[in-house]
Design a protein with these regions (language model features):
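Nucleotide-activated donor-binding/catalytic signature segment of Leloir-type glycosyltransferases, i.e.
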Residues: 139, 273-296
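Conserved donor-binding/catalytic core segment of Leloir-type glycosyltransferases
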Residues: 171, 224-240, 246-249, 260
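A short helix/loop element that forms part of the nucleotide-sugar donor recognition site in Leloir-type
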Residues: 207-223
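Glycosyltransferase donor-sugar binding loop
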Residues: 258-277
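Short alpha-helical donor nucleotide-sugar binding micro-motif in glycosyltransferases
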Residues: 295, 304-308
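Short hydrophobic beta-strand element within catalytic cores of glycosyltransferases
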Residues: 330, 334-337
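A short, well-ordered alpha-helix in the C-terminal region of glycosyltransferases
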Residues: 371, 378-392, 404
Length: 414
């Protein structure tokens, strides 16, 4: 009999990942593979989105349960966000964007967990989601059956530390995050409770890109035939190092080269941050050498990676396990990145030019850009090694690794 597994997603963005989101994309991978392998009876909790619901209607082996957020809750969130940004002048005002929605979502999921009976429950990446277990007697009901999947460092426990400690296992996206989780847990942290599930991407999606797909994007971006491209992908947040990359790119002054910045501050919701406005000012000095695409649908990303001569992902914080790094390697592209957080567990020196973060980071990044863009044989070597490294990075292996870390012993059929 199939095990009944529930995944509780963030409640911020819908499943499948029609509005983007790294965690949402990983959940979608598990769904896609379960549709083929059908090893578990999978249920995923998500906030409602009409497009996502339409896609999920075709699933045969997975049920997505949507929590529809009332208009009054959405309006309340907009008011809270406006107050935090404009009156309180909060620097991290985006953390106030979905407070009411999350509380409503947690309540809805908690009530449904009480009605249902699952063999495994996986809480995805935010301590507040433990409210789904603490309420309605679910912590006792699912004791020994629930897991926490950590994609980031925990910055606050929101009163749920004991619920967190009672997890059957704490699954992390890198050893870096696993070590941080142990610090949160405390000195008594039992080693067997901590497990690592390395991130993956849909390798078919990222490797099956046609020349026509690439030409289409080059035309959209008005690139000349002799233009080479440095590509950055991701949210335009300060910790991603995009400002430093733009400054380094301007300083490097590489002939016939454009910097293509793919992404926006907060996915597809139209918000523009003060930081984005600052980036636009920096780009003015580069004239047409720096191109902003804005939000790009995730299904279009493989062509943009394929278009790149080099991908640069210069995180200046302890990035746990950025999917953008994994995507670039999976496509087989030369990579420039940093040795921050969990990045070195994915991007090793044989596939990437590693730039240490220091006071002279912009200068060091400038040198790295000139080195990689100026040496075609070096770029080809990095690309070949990336293709070899990613050969075993498959959606199927991610699915079976996921089953194993939640104590469902299934061997991958190769």
């Amino acid at each position: 009999m199939e095990e009944k597994v529930a995944i509780v997603s963030s409640g911020y963005f819908p499943i499948p990942a029609v509005q983007g989101g790294a965690v949402e994309s990983l959940i979608e991978q598990i769904i896609n593979q379960n549709e083929q392998e059908n090893k578990i009876a999978l249920t995923v909790y998500s906030c409602f989105n009409a497009e996502a619901e339409k896609i999920s209607g075709a699933y045969q082996n997975t049920k997505v349960k949507y929590i529809a957020i009332p208009g009054v809750v959405q309006s309340l969130d907009k008011a809270i966000y406006w107050f935090a940004k404009n009156i309180l002048k909060k620097k991290k005002h985006m953390s106030y964007r979905y407070i009411a929605q999350r509380l409503y979502y947690i309540d809805g999921v908690s009530k449904d967990l009480k009605r249902e009976s699952y063999d495994r429950v996986v809480i995805e990446n935010h301590m507040t989601l433990f409210g789904t277990l603490k309420n309605n007697g679910n912590e006792i009901k699912y004791r020994g059956k629930y897991y926490y999947h950590a994609h980031n460092v925990i910055t606050a426990d929101y009163g749920y530390l004991n619920v967190f400690k009672n997890c059957k296992a704490i699954v992390s996206v890198s050893n870096y995050i696993a070590n941080e989780m142990k610090k949160t847990y405390g000195v008594e942290a039992p080693e067997e409770k901590f497990r690592v599930l390395l991130n993956r991407v849909n390798e078919k999606r990222f490797k099956n890109v046609t020349d026509e797909d690439v030409r289409s994007w080059r035309n959209k971006l008005h690139l000349d035939d002799n233009d080479r491209t440095v590509v950055f992908t991701g949210r335009l947040n300060p910790e991603k190092g995009i400002k430093e990359l733009m400054l380094a790119f301007n300083e490097a002054n590489i002939d016939n080269c454009k910097l293509v910045i793919v992404g926006s501050y907060y996915f597809q919701n139209g918000l523009k941050s003060e930081y984005e406005e600052e980036l636009e000012k920096i780009s003015e000095s580069a004239k047409d050498r720096i191109i902003f695409t804005g939000f790009v649908d995730y299904k279009e990303m493989p062509a943009l990676y394929k278009m790149a001569d080099v991908v640069v992902l210069p995180s200046i914080w302890n990035d746990p396990a950025p999917l953008t790094v994994i995507e670039a390697i999976t496509v087989g592209k030369p990579l420039i990145t940093t040795c921050s957080g969990g990045i070195p567990e994915y991007a090793t020196p044989d596939v990437a030019e590693i730039v240490p973060y220091s006071e002279n980071f912009v200068g060091d990044l400038t040198v790295a850009l000139r080195k990689v863009m100026g040496d075609e044989s070096y770029r080809e070597k990095l690309a070949r090694n990336a293709q070899k490294k990613s050969a075993l990075w498959t959606e199927k292996s991610y699915y079976y690794d996921f089953l194993n870390v939640i104590d469902i012993d299934e061997l991958e059929e190769r």
